[in-house]
Amino acid sequence: MTRTLRILLALAMTAAAVATSASAQAPATTAPRSGGPTELFRTALPDAPGKQLVVVELTIAPKQAGQPASPGHRHPGSVYVYVTEGTARFGVEGEPVKVVKTGESFFEAPGALHNVMESASATEGAKAIAVMIVPDGAPLTLPAH
């Protein structure tokens, strides 16, 4: 295992622990809404010039009946997703949709079309931490086209 990968995994686990702890202390609310990611951490990677490590928290709403499919999006760099709460479904074009439970992870290669991200439940949402490696100055997501 490379040094960079060990650091990424350690950061992901730390961010997941912080997010899970904060969630456990929060008062109960209605079902979460899917929204933009909440950025938790960003830093330059000295051993990968021109790249940044970004950690975000994702809140994934329950799948509503009749909800249209998302057109999807892409990421300019690698994305490692760790589910901290609930069960989510993640899909990348050309691969079967994966059901990912609390404590499990999902990987997206740079430029892959990410076309499914939803809770596996119609009544309960899910939460996840995404660790992203992005080129300096690049957005976190790109349109599907």
Task: For each feature predicted by the language model, list its residue ranges.
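Bacterial N-terminal signal peptides
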Residues: 8-18
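Ligand-binding loop in jelly-roll beta-barrel domains
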Residues: 97, 111-139
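Cleaved targeting-peptide boundary
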Residues: 21-34
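Bacterial N-terminal signal peptides that target proteins for export
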Residues: 1-9
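Short acidic-glycine-tyrosine-enriched beta hairpin
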Residues: 49-50, 60-61, 94-111
